[in-house]
């Protein structure tokens, strides 16, 4: 049984309201004296002082009185384009002096508080914050609806896009119903003098009612989830899909323009497909330029915004090449072909000016011969400029598919030579669509969070893997081998490949050369469709992927995928056939194996091609 304590000891062990800092830290019983007995025993009496507690944040449960003499300023950054980032809206509030100050404190002066909130967060605690209930991007205007009854139209809200956070298109921004549901739950009055007038674009008073009806229909077609995390994830996925195909028109525009330009159905289905795509892109750009001019923005402002918002290191900006040259002109088809040939001839010189940091594979191999040399000369390695590489690739494909392909309108449709040129133009359109529709969305989703250091690490990984593959090529000396990047730039060519094709080593490795320059048109079209669909990022179901690939194959005879290809179980190699260009201008039929090498992000960095000639017996 516990011994009963005397009354004096009970008094000393009685809990006190505030302990000293030492007793609070050591979790021992303190007394009311200062210094206390515990500190005196340890000779630290001069440091004995009360433990300061954190002040409680008292939140009123039954609503708050509206602040008096409260001025606010809602600042949202200016958007030169038609998109607004919903995941981050910067608010800047200027709190003036209020009558409801805490006792013991002097009235506070003007305090500038800047913070960031998510539009999906709960607005229950922010009783006086003006809420944005609609994002309207019709005709380049951003209309902000404030739920407050008192609106100050003389003050402006500045809209500017945050370059760090990716923009989201109109379909992901219309969360009107979501905000209205939250507005019904709020029972708190909103502050007056809210600034909601937009200043980035002139607000036209005579806005058509049709625009409002279109916005209402678009709001009803949106998908809303009960969870704000699901909404955020859905918006990110829509962002990936929308940004992956900029300036790419829909099918209705394609077919309508195609029927208008080609009344003959036999000529419109296959012929002039590349011209049709070029005209469509130019017309789309001209419409955008007209919209920009109507709302007071110049083309230079649009291009400046493009440079700020676009990713500086990762880009598939293939359709933006020469988009400003033919935006406002509508020449004939022959004049367009001549302009394309002239632009392609001058584009090489322009690209070389921007390629000052380029080091040819042969010169780089003279500096780096072993893995130790790679890490010793790591300062020489820079992230590869894939944007410039894809621009050069598009120029190479244009030369290969459109060189000398002038169309004679008086020629017969049944002419075999004319039909072949039409098919080549259609194949080029299929290749571009394959990149934009199949490869680009997955690639952007995998690289959306990469930074410059990741790209530098990716380049080091590529060079390290290239050294291993070159050593393997020396061991397997009987197979002609060629290694290229995901953009098609050749990095290594074995001696057997030189012997098979007859080309000089300096011709391939002393400049930027693409593997597609040494394949025929059919092999190039097959490669892009197989690589973008199966080889680039792998596949789960082989049979399902193969059936899907065969269904997506075009009806053109020159671009139809051959059925003679097979897969490996790991999804890293494909066996097929191709026609390899020789130095004498002829093509040699070969059985080839394309093996992909991916990095830790599952992004393809290298493709190794092995070629074995097929000699047909008469």
Curated annotation (Swiss-Prot):
Which GO biological-process labels does this protein carry?
Answer: cellular response to starvation
Query: What's this chain's function?
Result: Transcription factor which regulates nonfermentable carbon utilization. Binds specifically to 5'-CGGN(8)CGG-3' and 5'-CGGN(9)CGG-3' sequences in the promoter region.
Which stretches does UniProt call biased (Basic and acidic residues)?
335-352
Organism the protein comes from: Saccharomyces cerevisiae (strain RM11-1a)
User: Which gene holds the coding sequence for this protein?
Assistant: GSM1
Q: Which GO terms describe its cellular component?
A: nucleus
Q: What is this protein called?
A: Glucose starvation modulator protein 1
Location comes to:
Nucleus
Keyword terms: DNA-binding, Metal-binding, Nucleus, Transcription, Transcription regulation, Zinc
Pfam family example for this protein? Zn_clus
DNA binding happens at which residues?
20-48
